[in-house]
Amino acid sequence: MTSPLLESRRQLRKCAFQALMSLEFGTDVETACRFAYTHDREDTDVQLPAFLIDLVSGVQAKKEELDKQITQHLKAGWTIERLTLVERNLLRLGVFEITSFDTPQLVAVNEAIELAKDFSDQKSARFINGLLSQFVTEEQ
């Protein structure tokens, strides 16, 4: 039986972020998702949630497009490569969820900020908040 905690969208976003980080170092989407979803469980023979797979495979499929969208919102002289891997992947995840899911935009922004607080620092969380908020404002 699956834990309700692992089924929450917040927890699945965390797993998606961890899977995206794994993919930076070479693996496939399903393996990365399976490890992120089951790494602290005894039973690893579970069906992966569609939301998790959709987030990770979507970000991977649209990585170039997402990077272009993010780059358009960076300050002059900054490139996507200058960002940390954590920031890059959180921004990709946030922009993808904003543009590809029915998730309310402010929820997607807040979730990315919370992940930044968990996996980086306050400065990074403020940066992600600023960039994603600017992105949302321009999308409306």
UniProtKB/Swiss-Prot annotation:
One of its GO terms (molecular function) is RNA binding. InterPro entries: NusB-like_sf, NusB_fam, NusB_RsmB_TIM44. One of its GO terms (biological process) is DNA-templated transcription termination. The keyword Transferase does not apply. HAMAP family: NusB (MF_00073). Belongs to the NusB family. This is Transcription antitermination protein NusB.
